[in-house]
């Protein structure tokens, strides 16, 4: 079945997947999940209908605790209900999660997994919020990229309707929630074919109704509580099979190969990593590179259904030739013998043919710390370093306190040939991020290229440094890490050239665009010596543009984003510049007209760029 291609981020994909199944959405905004609720709200306001022929009813509460209470009440009243959250917001929902799961009420919570504040607040991604919910009774389904959010988000809704067990569908905050990819989308009718409407009707009949009274929410004594608590076992035993069935239905429709645990790599791999989340795409890319270039035999087991955890399915996924396993967890559980996924894997392999295989435990990516192919290579190589082998390790940092970190050997360019990487340095609120979001959507929607965009910025957002990372190529892009070897680098703020080491990221023969007010002798005076040396030694094509001057001439003030966006399309030569300018104007209309902004001046900044 051919599906329509669209360019969107993970939050939009989650909203797209959830909307057909949602009658009520109880919401409270929290970074980085807010966009899911915002998009749902916009569609509902426009009268977009769900599978049941009605727009979604939105209820914004005073906090996430109130939102989860509303979810509980709405489900008890017989309305299919969804919410979206992350981090402390998810923690506030935990008391109600126990109630929802205990009463076997089908719902899905879409979570853009985010760090939970410990010694400091961090608004970026890891799995500490997800792991905090693993004993609530919610099933947990993980998506590793934007396409999987679209597909597995749908599987979560189908499975909860069928099996009554509520689901947390999670994906990495920022790295997946805010990453823009060109993906295949569901049509409403394609989803309708897979829904068990008899189960929907059964759910509605269980709703609280004074015409059919039932007793719920009782206080039970020791004589019966234990027995009643165990009564849910058959439902949880059935969930892995239900999820697998719906994965197979999706596979049949669209030609994918979703399983509870997916294996990737050499069929006779000797070293296998077990992980879940966006790091899996980086691991797959690294496996492809090392197996081809260095003749290694490496593999990955990608965890999709984390709860209920099916040990036999994990064992099936691991090649019989495996001699070493490394489990990567994106959280820290101080005082524990190991992090949660590691302990699950150790318990699952006890008493199997892998009982004597060495299993190492690694931590990575806390608070969105970048995880690169070079670090993944170090994980695989750790097993071969007999004298320095570390059964417990960290990657991505230099631990000079407890010496757990693995050493990495420089940069590893594992991206497939033909992938173009571009990097843009901007100032928060100068429009650089917004312009690049439009740029990647133009490339994705108007060429046959695959496209990816990710935007790195600090918690201040406005006034801080922003770095936009754009990739495009003829093959799917699995590079879920920051660009450190770029074909094109643009500096949109001249003061950065003396503060940040940006030109060293440009590949030999690449392009550097500097927005500055300097000309000729002034440029030679202000440009640091090491920058000039690198440009000369690596044959870098160097261009300058006075975007500030152009912006002031046409009345834009300091908003130089569209001027520099035009310059990028001119230099990158991806699509004809006249077409690019037309698409940029269309994108600006879509982005800003609803905000009452001035869209064009004469001449347009896109023409002047």
How does the language model describe each region?
Residues 24-60, 274-301, 421-485, 489:
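Anionic-ligand anchoring segments at beta-strand to alpha-helix junctions in alpha/beta enzyme folds, i.e.
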Residues 520-540:
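Rossmann-fold NAD(P)-binding glycine/threonine-rich loop
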Residues 505-527:
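ADP-ribose/adenylate-binding Rossmann-like module
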Residues 1-132, 137, 154, 373, ...:
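Thiamine diphosphate
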Residues 52-56, 167-262:
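Conformationally flexible catalytic loops at phosphate/diphosphate-handling active centers
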Residues 123-173, 350-365, 537-544:
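Conserved thiamine diphosphate
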Residues 600-609:
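Conserved small/polar residues in nucleotide/adenosyl-binding loops
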């Amino acid at each position: 079945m051919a599906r329509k291609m669209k360019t969107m981020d993970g939050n939009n994909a989650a909203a797209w997947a959830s909307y057909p199944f949602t009658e009520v959405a109880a919401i409270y905004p929290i970074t980085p999940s807010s966009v899911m609720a915002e998009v749902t709200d916009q569609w509902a306001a426009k009268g977009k209908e769900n599978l049941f022929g009605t727009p979604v009813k939105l209820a914004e509460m005073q906090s996430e605790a109130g939102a989860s209470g509303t979810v509980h009440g709405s489900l008890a009243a017989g309305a299919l209900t969804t919410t979206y959250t992350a981090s402390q917001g998810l923690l506030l929902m935990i008391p109600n999660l126990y109630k929802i799961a205990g009463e076997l009420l089908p719902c899905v919570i879409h979570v853009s997994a985010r760090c939970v504040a410990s010694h400091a607040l961090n608004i970026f991604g890891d799995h500490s919020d997800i792991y905090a919910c693993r004993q609530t009774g919610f099933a947990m389904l993980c998506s590793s990229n934007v396409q999987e959010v679209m597909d597995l988000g749908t599987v979560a809704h189908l499975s909860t309707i069928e099996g009554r067990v509520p689901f947390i569908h999670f994906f990495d905050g920022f790295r997946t929630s805010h990453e823009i990819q060109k993906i295949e989308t569901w049509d409403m009718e394609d989803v309708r074919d897979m829904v068990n409407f008899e189960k929907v009707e059964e759910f509605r009949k269980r709703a609280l109704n004074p015409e059919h009274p039932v007793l719920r929410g009782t206080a039970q004594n020791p004589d019966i509580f234990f027995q009643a608590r165990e009564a849910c076992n058959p439902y949880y035993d059935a969930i892995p099979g239900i999820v697998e069935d719906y994965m197979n239905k999706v596979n049949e429709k669209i030609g994918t190969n979703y399983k509870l645990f997916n294996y990737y790599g050499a069929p006779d791999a000797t070293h296998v990593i077990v992980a879940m989340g966006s790091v899996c795409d980086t691991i797959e890319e690294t496996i492809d590179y090392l197996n081809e270039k260095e003749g290694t035999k490496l593999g990955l087991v990608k965890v999709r259904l984390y709860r209920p955890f099916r040990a036999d399915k994990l064992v099936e996924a691991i090649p019989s030739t495996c001699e070493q396993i490394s489990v990567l967890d994106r959280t820290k559980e101080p005082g524990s013998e190991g992090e949660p996924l590691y302990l699950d894997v150790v318990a699952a392999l006890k008493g199997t043919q892998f009982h004597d295989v060495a299993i190492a435990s690694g931590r990575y990516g806390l608070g969105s710390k970048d995880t690169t192919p070079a670090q993944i290579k170090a994980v695989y190589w750790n097993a071969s370093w007999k004298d320095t082998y570390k059964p417990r390790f960290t990657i991505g940092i230099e631990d000079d306190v407890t010496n757990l970190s693995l050493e990495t050997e420089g940069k590893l360019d594992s991206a497939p040939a033909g992938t173009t990487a571009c990097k843009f340095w901007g100032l928060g609120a100068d429009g650089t991020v917004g312009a690049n979001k439009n740029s990647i959507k133009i490339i994705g929607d108007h060429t046959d290229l695959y496209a990816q965009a990710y935007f790195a910025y600090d918690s201040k957002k406005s006034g801080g440094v922003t770095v936009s990372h754009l990739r495009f190529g003829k093959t799917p892009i699995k590079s879920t890490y920051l660009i450190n070897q770029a074909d094109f680098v643009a500096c949109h703020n001249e003061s950065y050239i003396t503060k940040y080491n940006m030109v060293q990221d440009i590949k030999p023969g690449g392009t550097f665009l500097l927005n500055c007010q300097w000309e000729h002798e002034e440029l030679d005076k202000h440009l640091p010596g090491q920058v000039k040396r690198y440009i000369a030694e690596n044959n870098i094509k160097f261009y300058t543009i006075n975007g500030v001057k152009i912006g002031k001439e046409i009345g834009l003030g300091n908003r130089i984003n569209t001027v520099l966006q035009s310059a990028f399309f001119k230099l990158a030569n991806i699509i004809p510049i006249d077409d690019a300018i037309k698409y940029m104007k269309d994108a600006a209309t879509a982005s800003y007209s609803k905000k009452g902004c001035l869209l064009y001046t004469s001449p347009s900044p896109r023409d002047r760029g």
